[in-house]
UniProtKB/Swiss-Prot annotation:
It is found in: Membrane. Its main location: membrane. The chain crosses the membrane at residues 7-27, 270-290. Its EC number is 2.4.1.370. One of its GO terms (cellular component) is Golgi apparatus. It is an enzyme of class 2 (transferase). Involved in the synthesis of mannosyl phosphorylinositol ceramide. Catalyzes the addition of mannosyl to phosphorylinositol ceramide. Suppressor of RVS161 mutation. It catalyses: a 1D-myo-inositol-1-phospho-N-[(R)-2-hydroxy-very-long-chain fatty acyl]-(R)-4-hydroxysphingoid base + GDP-alpha-D-mannose = an alpha-D-mannosyl-(1<->6)-1D-myo-inositol-1-phospho-N-[(R)-2-hydroxy-very-long-chain fatty acyl]-(R)-4-hydroxysphingoid base + GDP + H(+). This is Mannosyl phosphorylinositol ceramide synthase SUR1.
Length: 382
């Protein structure tokens, strides 16, 4: 096997391993294992007496101010009417800031410097659930039945489409290990991905929470540290569902439309990916052919350390410095220049060029031997 091919294979293996290492959590999201932790029918509608409630009866919601938009008031009121025995807290931006400042000062700098307000709205919900416990509900989610059956689990999230979990409805006991892990991971995932939609999703949104959930499941989960998953049928659109949805996603910017369009054209995205992969492979094949070519071999022979020295000294001399090359370095550079001149001449002529060595008589030099290191360019002789 040619050494060039070995180098190329090793490079591709290292590249592939690096990609797998940095995207492993995203790749694992392709495996839908939410069924293992699903909240079942018998859990929500038990024949026996209901299980004791673990999650505190607190409903948390967030908004910029206390002036909630009109189209969300009906859903909010439904939650209040169905749960008169629950404590209700609407977290405004000012309340969230003061809470982080007083209880989690180590996170205040990150909290203040989030690029998008929705990132702060996402982050605060993890902190309040970890600190107080209870159920967090987005303002665009209206309640359709009592939440009491969901309080029997240490923590719950809801499954989202097509993969992973969402952060619009969540419940937890105080200091649940999953939400503690989420808090500790927020700083690490605070990265700007150039596209607002991906930045929000990956730093604090559902994608972030899904990645943390996958990592958490690889831990040795403590006995009381399980996270149960509310399935889509129990989330909305059925008579037995817990929630209904009104107009939401107020944080979506223009780029979100593109991302949603891509979700609706999965096949086109896959085909585009294959085409892109083909061009990458073709580029690597072209690069390999160049490595194996004579041009590359000549290039590696000519570009020696002495040639680099010549260029470096030339640059310094042009700046006003007066540096001289050693005789051996100068001779090598001259030989390299001569070889390039001969190569250019050979393209235009098939005749022999006579080269004279300073201390020897004239010899006829055959261009095809390309032994330029022993000769200097002279006049033609018969």
């Amino acid at each position: 096997m040619r050494k060039e091919l070995k180098y190329l294979i090793c490079f591709n293996i290292l590249l592939l391993l690096s990609i797998i290492y940095y995207t492993f959590d995203l790749l694992t999201l392709c495996i839908d294992d939410t069924v293992k932790d699903a909240i079942l029918e018998e859990d929500l509608n038990p024949d026996a007496p209901p299980k004791p409630q673990l999650i505190p009866k607190i409903i948390h919601q967030t908004y910029k101010t206390e002036d909630i938009p009109e189209h969300w008031k009906e859903g909010r009121q439904k939650c209040l009417d169905l749960h008169p025995d629950y404590k209700y807290i609407l977290w405004t931006d000012e309340m969230a800031y003061e809470f982080i400042k007083e209880e989690y000062p180590w996170f205040l700098d990150t909290f203040e410097n989030y690029k998008y307000p929705i990132e702060r709205a996402d982050a605060i919900r993890y902190f309040i659930l970890s600190h107080y416990g209870g159920v967090y509900i987005d303002l665009d989610d209206g309640c359709e039945r009592k939440l009491d059956p969901l309080l029997a689990f240490p923590a719950f999230l809801r499954k989202t489409s097509p993969l992973g979990v969402s952060n619009d409805v969540m419940g937890s006991v105080p200091r649940h290990p999953f939400f503690l892990k989420a808090l500790k991971s927020l700083k690490h995932y605070d990265k700007y991905w150039f596209i607002p939609y991906m930045t929000i999703m990956g730093s604090t949104g559902p994608l972030f929470l899904s990645v943390i959930w996958k990592q958490y499941k690889r831990w040795r989960i403590p006995k009381n540290g399980t996270v149960r998953i509310l399935q889509p049928a129990y989330y909305k659109m059925h008579s037995y569902s817990f929630f209904s949805i009104t107009k939401g996603s107020s944080w979506h910017l223009d780029d979100a439309k593109l991302m949603k369009a891509l979700e609706n054209h999965i096949l086109s995205c896959v085909v585009t990916g294959f085409i892109f992969g083909f061009f990458i492979l073709y580029g690597e094949f072209t690069f390999y052919c160049w490595l194996c070519s004579k041009n590359f071999s000549n290039l590696t022979k000519n570009w020696k350390l002495n040639a680099i020295k010549v260029r470096f000294v030339t640059i310094l001399n042009s700046l006003g410095l007066r540096l001289k090359l050693s005789k051996s370095t100068s001779d090598t550079a001259s030989a390299t220049l001569l070889a390039r001149q001969q190569k250019r001449l050979r393209k235009d002529s098939n005749t022999n060029i006579v080269l004279l060595k300073s201390s020897r008589k004239s010899d006829v030099y055959d261009l095809e031997k390309n032994d330029s290191s022993k000769y200097s360019l002279g006049n033609n002789s018969s």
